[in-house]
């Protein structure tokens, strides 16, 4: 079930470097006007990619979108310093209608994990079940993680969901030792 083989988009990759980390290392987007990547720009790139308005080398891959939107959803539950910035809130509010219209169902699920999502395979159902917990910052047990990894290694799970699971589980397990370096 591999999606597109596009990307990664460099600007979205820069945004991911800032937001796809744990609760102590995340750097919200758009805190300053001089930040290298602004949340509006990232969402514009993602939407242009979804509409196929970018060149192939500038498009955002399904996996990249999955990781980004999972990270943003998880960050809603982070401590205040690493939770969403006012610029992120404003950008998501501004583009909410377009995101709803142009994002595939798996991305909408990552944005709103309490909504219904219809898995297309048993393996994807395993991953979606785990993501419902991961996106709420809950930890998977060793056995649950093993089961999810086996499902991800098949070619029967959408790339966005694979990336969301890996990034999300990683973000939830940031340790204090990592923060110290």
Indicate where each model-derived feature is located.
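Acidic, glycine/proline-rich low-complexity segments that act as flexible tails and inter-domain linkers
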Residues: 1-181
